Amino acid sequence: ASDGKANLHQGAVGVGLCLRTGRALRAVQFGNPLRHHPDTGLDLYDLKVPHWDTLLTLAASCYEMSGLGYIGTDMVLDKFRGPMLLELNARPGLAIQIANGRGLVPNLKTIEKLGQVKMNVEQRVNFAKDHFGIFDE
């Protein structure tokens, strides 16, 4: 199992998610495909992240907090407080691309084509869902 590791390069389980729905698309550990959680045996493809829209809104609001154009957000779902921001990463790991099954370059090119268009948090969330969601339903 991941032995409590939170980073993919250290052995954490990574689950690629559809940005539109929060449903699992695929999973990896140590860069290899994985279907079942190594500790619980649960089918990772059955995962649907609760509070998905709140998590996306929280992540999209980090732009104003940080002023950075590209960041990684680490979030947790607290039993009592719900979605919470754990940390921001100015240089997030890129191994999640393996779990997502697609690279970032096409997404970044789509964003670059926008130029200096200003969007509020809700518009950014909707843009990401519409352009980067993998339509799994």
Give each language-model segment a name.
Residues 3-78:
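A long amphipathic alpha-helix within ATP-dependent nucleotide-binding catalytic cores
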Residues 36-54, 64, 77-137:
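C-terminal active-site "lid" helix and adjoining low-complexity regulatory extension at the edge
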